[in-house]
């Protein structure tokens, strides 16, 4: 039934024309069922602005598959590391960014729309570190523009095809596999697409920036050369192999020395055919393609030219057959090739006249350098030629009106050894950051001025001072100093480097520069980078020697000569351009400043290319140096939200009775007055919003949230009736979900603990016997046992002694260090060990002037630890290469932490002996032998450790204990389902038949077995066992006097001590009883019935007091008349019997309990174990073991692809921890079967639907 019209309210017919009425459609009730938003899609609406808040919001969205987020008009993209559907492309066509979720298509649509609407050039700047998804974002933008730009003309479609074909072609020649990215762009490119007046592409142009040509001749371990070399050597035809003498990539030095020929997600043969296809689309002729591959063959064979040193120190070619083939490919004389590669012609001049000519032979190192220089020059010039040839094919067919530029450039780089390449890359990124800051603030300010909005200008850091430091000519910057050094000492690279070092000293007045000898530091926006001067001037010159240019000039191959068109004039006094001059950053900046920018900031979620791992720490660092927090603050400095009057009214007209009725738009005035009416009717304060010329501005995000909440409630109220009809179903659904969640929560932690525990098994790799308590099912790895990361006094003192600053402590514990003293044998001495992210700290406790203090005895950087030695027995000793030999209860956990922190570079050596450096240049050896007489831990004496046999090396952790089954409540219990559904009566539980237990009769020996009582199966067994016991002996007899207590030494605490688990916390002047002394400085004491360990230097002896007379015995009472109950495990004692304690796991034998004859020792019960007593008198508490707090493991990340390929080992080492299926631990007992739970939920859901 349709709702009736409100009295006195007249609805304007749709046919009548009114201001803005015809453009607003009736509100749709389906909006109330839209998918709930995860986080906020525009981070200018964050309630709390901080780097952590930005990180948390990005993590929420990325975890739920939302990889895109806005900061105003800036798009943040977090690489998902998985393929995504492109079916959403049409959703963004003709829509503004507020109408659809954030996406790279939204940025492309905005740029294309603004170009057509405002007739302004646009550019999209994509930035981020390597592997963050810059190239993929650029592909999506080109794909979107090709689809939406229209045009049916064949020439327009040809331009679109060529623009898309540039991607596989330039990726093959300009991308390579690195440690961080399998398809890393090793060059920067700026693609400009030209459009005519109606928005159709009529041409394009690509500008190349700084190809990493050094990769051609060398790569680090597990990286590859450019893709095209592997595609060519694997996918070439038989004709090409015959023509170029081509073999596999393993046959060439330039492609095989890095030991990475295959990549899991790259098909080189398929990519080779795609490259050939792209060449055809671009318009490269077969002859041009043949010449390109011939140049690649020349580069590959040049790498195989090897040199050997002769007796006079000069070089000679090892295999002249290789140079003969190089001469054949270059169409040059092979003898000239050999001569140019092994010697150099030097010409002297005097007074401007030509002097003598000398033929100087080269040593092998110089010859190798010349060979590599020629190979790099050929490939670099070939890449430049390909880019130029693409531009020729894509040149404009007609006059163009506007341009859309797409910048895909290398990200900021910081390595251990940074040289000239990193300086150039970081300089370009510094310039882009400057553009980002200036244009963002400029656009913001212009909008406020244009809309006549009052606001306060924002102060920000201008990194122009860093750009001037690098590029300025007067006063000279870094590039100018490099050019001057190359000009003054051009003949000697070492002298040129020294000249550059002297010139950089003049730059020290800049606060962002710091000279440090042969290195210098630049404080970039993304962090401080230390650059190495060695080789910088030589790389900056970037020119071939005259001999190599003459070799190219003598070639009969015209294509090869075309690659080297510019040859320096020897008589010219003009300095040739250097590599720094060729960066062309100024030209790039000029092009970008002429266009209206759109920004895409890409973020890399992890270094493992995993689609499920979100590295919070790494992403937080990227958020900081990308300046996302500052960008949000700039956007929110004036007003957090703005929109046109028309869009504002269309969004919120439901909130005012003056603008809507029953979902119909009824406002007859203009849009601006409609906005004001809505804001007034919703009670928004006047200082929270302003009206501009064309837009409404809202100051705080909370105001916008309030408007959105009121709008959502409108539809919620309308949907309340529908919700009632589904109430029973929703309750049932939620109950199923809660049960599944409850089951999962109860078991997921156990899985994480098992995975962390198994990591230690993988490191030991079945090479070491294990202690029994190391194989507990849920032994937790806490790590920081001394609480350095907490607020305990001990942790604070140790942290202060270590001076760790802001470093995070991953492991800390008490240990014993083997200390050698003069004239005496070595002896274990108590110490403290603290492991941080950077180093291992060993501390000692000492007493001075009656005060205890902790002193740092040694600090070992993690980078210096090469190996760890352990025995193959169950002892706790281990030795790190570089002196210390320690004994640690948590040895497996310590080794696991060191392996993780060093990324598996530490070698774990396990054997019957440990060899360590006792003193400088003096090695010592410690032996480990089995000795079953050692009852507790191990015994060290004279470089020999005696230890009892442990669990077998291949032992695995014990399965978790089974839980006691509880009462299962049916899911249909209560009002979840209506009558007629599944029965809610629980099934009757069967009563197990009790087992008869022998009962000792009173007055007889405890070993006598009583007859079995007759017990009915249906009756619960009674403790009386059917017989009436004799009455208890009379209790009115006075007890005998207690025996005299032995004199126990008592000690008083001199200082307060805050103990951990297993330790006794003491206050000053507390009196404790001494139970056991240990020679390691810790005593076992007892106070108020509780035992624990305390340091002996905190205690002082209390003089014994006089023993007082015992108190009189209590009055006797008559014995009770009731019969005492006898349980199945209790013992009826006579007058001479003593109470017996029954511990868990101990069962009575022959009807009687075995007395506990000796106290429980530390080698049979862990410190955390607290056995409870069964029926009978309470025994004295067992002796507490030395402190061993439980460990809380860090949850291991789950990798879908298994562990990464480890580096080639130099010595035996344990396999890296893996969470792949092959190494997944067995399912714990009691683990929830989620598949069964979900199946049960689906079954009940079907039953419910059938009932309804």
Curated annotation (Swiss-Prot):
ATP-binding is among the record's keywords: yes
> Region Actin-binding: what ranges?
403-485
**What is the name of the gene encoding this protein?**
MYO1
Q: Which SUPFAM superfamilies match?
A: P-loop containing nucleoside triphosphate hydrolases, SH3-domain
Q: Where is the composition biased (Pro residues)?
A: 989-999, 1028-1046, 1178-1193, 1204-1215
This chain belongs to which protein, by name? Myosin-1
Task: Kindly provide the PTM information from the record.
Answer: Phosphorylation of the TEDS site (Ser-356) is required for the polarization of the actin cytoskeleton. Phosphorylation probably activates the myosin-I ATPase activity.
Q: Which SMART domains has this protein been placed in?
A: MYSc, SH3
* Skewed-composition ranges (Polar residues): 1162-1175
Q: Which residues form the SH3 domain?
A: 1046-1104
- Which stretches make up the IQ domain? 716-736, 737-762
The terms under GO molecular function for this entry are:
actin filament binding; ATP binding; hydrolase activity; microfilament motor activity
Q: Which residues are ATP-binding?
A: 128-135
Q: Which GO terms describe its cellular component?
A: actin cortical patch; cell tip; myosin complex; plasma membrane
Give the GO biological process terms. Answer: actin cortical patch localization; actin filament organization; endocytosis
Q: Which Pfam families does the annotation name?
A: Myosin_head, Myosin_TH1, SH3_2
Query: Which residue ranges does the record assign to the TH1 domain?
Result: 770-953
| Positions of the Myosin motor domain | 38-712
């Amino acid at each position: 039934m349709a709702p009736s019209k409100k009295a006195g309210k007249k609805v304007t017919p749709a046919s009548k024309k009114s201001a803005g009425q015809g453009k607003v459609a009736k509100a749709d009730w389906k909006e109330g069922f839209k998918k709930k938003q995860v986080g906020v899609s525009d981070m200018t609406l964050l309630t709390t602005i901080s780097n952590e808040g930005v990180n948390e919001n990005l993590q929420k969205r990325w975890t739920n598959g939302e990889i895109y987020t806005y900061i105003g008009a800036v798009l943040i993209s977090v690489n998902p590391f998985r393929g995504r559907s492109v079916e959403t492309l049409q959703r963004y066509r003709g829509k503004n960014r507020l109408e659809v979720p954030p996406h790279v298509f939204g940025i492309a649509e905005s740029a294309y729309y603004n170009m057509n609407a405002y007739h302004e050039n646009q550019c999209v700047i994509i930035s981020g570190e390597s592997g963050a998804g810059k190239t993929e974002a650029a592909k999506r933008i080109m794909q979107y523009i090709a689809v939406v730009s229209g045009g049916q003309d064949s020439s327009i479609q040809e331009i679109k095809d060529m623009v898309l074909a540039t991607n596989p072609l330039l990726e093959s020649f300009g991308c390579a596999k690195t440690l961080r990215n399998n398809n890393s762009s090793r060059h920067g490119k700026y693609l400009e697409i030209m459009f005519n007046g109606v928005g159709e592409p009529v041409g394009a142009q690509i500008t190349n920036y700084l190809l990493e040509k050094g990769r051609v001749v060398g790569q680090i371990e597990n990286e590859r050369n450019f893709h095209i070399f592997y595609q060519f050597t694997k996918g070439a035809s038989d004709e090409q192999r015959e023509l170029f003498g081509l073999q596999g990539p393993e046959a060439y030095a330039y492609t095989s020395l890095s030991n990475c020929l295959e990549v899991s997600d790259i098909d080189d043969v398929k990519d080779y055919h795609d490259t050939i296809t792209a060449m055809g689309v671009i318009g490269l002729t077969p002859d041009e393609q043949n010449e390109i591959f011939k140049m690649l063959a020349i580069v590959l064979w040049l790498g195989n030219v090897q040199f050997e040193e002769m007796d006079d120190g000069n070089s000679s070619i090892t295999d002249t057959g290789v140079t003969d083939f190089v001469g054949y490919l270059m169409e040059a004389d092979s003898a000239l090739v050999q001569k140019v590669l092994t010697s150099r012609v030097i010409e002297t001049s005097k007074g401007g006249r030509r002097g003598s000519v000398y033929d100087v032979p080269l040593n092998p190192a110089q010859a190798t350098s010349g060979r590599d220089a020629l190979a790099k020059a050929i490939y670099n010039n070939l890449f430049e030629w390909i880019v130029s040839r693409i531009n020729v094919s894509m040149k404009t067919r007609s006059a163009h009106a506007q341009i859309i530029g797409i910048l895909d450039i290398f990200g900021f780089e910081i390595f251990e050894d940074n040289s000239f390449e990193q300086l150039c890359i970081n300089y370009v990124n510094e310039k882009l950051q400057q553009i980002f800051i200036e244009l963002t603030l400029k656009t913001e300010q212009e909008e406020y001025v244009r809309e006549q909005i009052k606001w306060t200008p924002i102060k920000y850091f201008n990194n122009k001072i860093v750009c001037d430091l690098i590029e300025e000519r007067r006063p000279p910057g870094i590039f100018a100093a490099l050019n001057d050094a190359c000009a003054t000492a051009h003949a000697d690279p070492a002298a040129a480097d020294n000249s550059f070092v002297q010139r950089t000293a003049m730059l020290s007045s800049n606060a962002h520069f710091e000279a440090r000898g042969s290195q210098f530091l630049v404080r970039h926006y993304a962090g401080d980078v230390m650059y190495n001067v060695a080789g910088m001037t030589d790389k900056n010159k970037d020119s071939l020697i005259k001999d190599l240019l003459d070799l190219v000039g003598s070639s009969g191959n015209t294509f090869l000569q075309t690659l080297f068109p510019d040859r320096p004039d020897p008589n010219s006094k003009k300095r040739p351009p250097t590599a720094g001059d060729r960066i062309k950053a100024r030209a790039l900046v000029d092009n970008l400043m002429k266009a209206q920018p759109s920004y895409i900031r890409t973020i890399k979620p992890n270094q493992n290319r995993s689609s499920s791992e979100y590295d919070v720490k790494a992403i937080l660092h990227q958020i900081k140096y990308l300046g996302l927090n500052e960008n949000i603050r700039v956007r929110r400095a004036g007003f957090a939200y703005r929109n046109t009057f028309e869009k504002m009214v269309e969004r919120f007209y439901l909130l005012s009775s003056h603008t809507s009725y029953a979902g119909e738009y009824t406002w007859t005035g203009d849009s601006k007055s409609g906005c004001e009416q809505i804001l007034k009717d919703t009670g928004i304060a006047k200082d929270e919003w302003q009206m501009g010329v064309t837009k409404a501005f809202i100051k705080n995000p909370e105001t916008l949230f309030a408007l959105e909440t009121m709008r959502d409630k409108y539809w919620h109220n309308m949907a309340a009736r529908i919700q009632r009809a589904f109430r029973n179903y929703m309750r049932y659904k939620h109950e199923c979900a809660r049960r599944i969640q409850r089951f999962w929560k109860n078991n997921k932690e156990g899985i994480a603990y098992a995975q962390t525990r198994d990591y230690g098994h993988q490191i030991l790799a079945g090479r070491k016997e294990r202690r029994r308590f190391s194989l507990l099912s849920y032994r937790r790895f806490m790590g920081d046992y001394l609480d350095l990361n907490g607020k305990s006094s001990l942790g604070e003192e140790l942290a202060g002694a270590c001076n760790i600053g802001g470093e995070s402590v991953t492991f800390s514990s008490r240990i014993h260090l083997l200390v050698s003293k003069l004239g005496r044998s070595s002896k274990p001495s108590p110490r403290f060990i603290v492991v941080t992210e950077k180093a291992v700290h060993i501390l000692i406790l000492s007493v001075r002037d009656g005060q205890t203090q902790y002193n740092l005895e040694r600090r070992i950087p993690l980078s210096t630890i090469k190996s760890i030695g352990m025995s193959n027995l169950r002892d706790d000793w281990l030795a790190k290469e570089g002196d210390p030999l320690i004994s640690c209860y948590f040895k497996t956990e310590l080794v696991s932490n060191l392996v993780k922190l060093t990324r598996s570079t530490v070698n774990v050596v396990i054997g019957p002996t440990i060899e360590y450096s006792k003193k400088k240049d003096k090695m010592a050896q410690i032996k480990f032998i089995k000795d079953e007489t050692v009852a507790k831990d191990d015994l060290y004496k004279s470089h020999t450790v005696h230890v009892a046999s442990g669990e077998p090396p291949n032992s695995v952790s014990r399965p978790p204990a089974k839980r006691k089954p509880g009462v299962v409540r049916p899911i249909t219990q209560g009002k979840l389902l209506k009558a007629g559904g599944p029965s809610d009566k629980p099934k009757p539980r069967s009563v197990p038949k009790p087992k008869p237990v022998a009962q000792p009769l009173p007055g007889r020996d405890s070993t006598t077995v009583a007859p079995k009582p007759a017990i009915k199966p249906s009756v619960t067994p009674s403790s009386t066992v059917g017989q009436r016991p004799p009455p208890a002996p009379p209790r009115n007899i006075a007890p005998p006097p207690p025996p005299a207590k032995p004199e126990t030494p008592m000690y008083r605490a001199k200082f307060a001590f805050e103990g951990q688990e297993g330790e006794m916390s003491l206050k000053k002047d507390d009196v404790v009883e001494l139970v056991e002394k240990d020679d390691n400085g810790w005593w076992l004491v007892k106070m108020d019935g509780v035992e624990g360990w305390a340091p002996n230097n905190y205690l002082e002896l209390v003089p014994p007091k006089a023993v007082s007379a015992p108190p009189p015995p209590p009055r006797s009472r008559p014995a009770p008349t009731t019969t005492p109950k006898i349980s199945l495990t209790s013992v009826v004692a006579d007058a001479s019997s003593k109470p017996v304690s029954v511990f868990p796991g101990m069962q009575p034998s022959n009807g009687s309990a075995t007395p506990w004859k000796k106290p429980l020792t530390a080698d049979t019960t862990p410190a955390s174990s607290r056995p409870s007593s069964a029926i009978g008198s309470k025994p004295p508490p067992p002796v507490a073991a030395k402190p061993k707090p439980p460990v809380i493991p860090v949850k291991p990340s789950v990798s879908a692809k298994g562990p990464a390929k480890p580096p080639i080992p130099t010595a035996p080492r344990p396999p890296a921890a893996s969470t792949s299926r092959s190494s997944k631990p067995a399912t714990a007992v009691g683990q929830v079967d989620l598949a069964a739970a979900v199946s049960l939920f689906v079954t009940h859901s079907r039953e419910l639907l059938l009932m309804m």
